[in-house]
């Protein structure tokens, strides 16, 4: 992936940054692409760095992701909840699967989506092969993950567990407006040009 460079004028001359480093100076973190251990480590490091720098200022986490590994996503979520800084979450494009959990886990009152964003909630996906006992272990782990994810959705949206269980039985795509009504986000960001 080509990462743009930004040139900034300083008293000492010019300084070149990759765009993500420049955004980090403004307390903006971009979560884009599949959530995996490598991405989680990068996002967690940025959250910890910004919190250590100044824990009285908000951190903005922009999310455009198809989701990914549950344990990686939960590590990001735990860090968001651990740090003192409020974490504002903003869906841009798609916040699907584990990314929707991160979106709704932002600080209450500071969870947003752009007007044309899509949010997808569903049950965890997984597969297993091998001996029957190994398959049973994997199936039990998926059931535990589903219960955990549904409890997070219950806590963050206020929806009854039974409704969440039903609504996540299959892929459930929501518009920004539907995500707001469901309680996944607090507001839809308006067009600043109008």
Curated annotation (Swiss-Prot):
Positions of the catalytic residues: 97 (nucleophile), 122
GO biological process terms, semicolon-separated: protein quality control for misfolded or incompletely synthesized proteins
UniProt KW keywords: Cytoplasm, Hydrolase, Protease, Serine protease
Pfam family, one: CLP_protease
Coarse class of the protein's main subcellular location: cytoplasm
Record's keyword annotation contains Cell inner membrane: no
GO CC terms: cytoplasm; endopeptidase Clp complex
NCBIfam families referenced in this protein's UniProt entry, alphabetically: clpP, PRK00277.1, PRK12553.1
Family: Belongs to the peptidase S14 family.
HAMAP family linked: ClpP
Task of the protein: Cleaves peptides in various proteins in a process that requires ATP hydrolysis. Has a chymotrypsin-like activity. Plays a major role in the degradation of misfolded proteins.
Name of the molecule in the record: ATP-dependent Clp protease proteolytic subunit
Gene assigned in the entry: clpP
């Amino acid at each position: 992936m080509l990462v743009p460079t930004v040139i900034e004028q300083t008293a000492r001359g010019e300084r070149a940054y990759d765009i993500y480093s420049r955004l980090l100076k403004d307390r903006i973190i971009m979560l884009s692409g599949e959530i995996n251990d490598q991405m989680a480590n990068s996002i967690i490091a940025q959250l910890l760095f910004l919190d250590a720098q100044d824990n009285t200022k908000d951190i903005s986490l922009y999310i455009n992701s198809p989701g990914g590994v549950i344990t990686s996503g939960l590590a990001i979520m735990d860090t968001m909840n651990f740090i003192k800084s409020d974490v504002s979450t903003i869906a841009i494009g798609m916040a699907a699967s584990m990314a929707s959990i991160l979106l709704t886990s932002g600080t209450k009152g500071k969870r947003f989506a752009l007007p044309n964003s899509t949010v997808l909630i569903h049950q965890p996906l997984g597969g297993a092969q091998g001996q029957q006992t190994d398959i049973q272990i994997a199936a039990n782990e998926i059931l535990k993950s589903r219960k955990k994810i549904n409890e997070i959705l219950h806590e963050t949206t206020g929806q009854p567990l039974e409704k969440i269980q039903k609504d996540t039985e299959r892929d459930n795509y929501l518009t920004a407006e539907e995500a707001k009504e469901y309680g996944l986000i607090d507001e839809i960001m308006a067009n600043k040009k109008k």
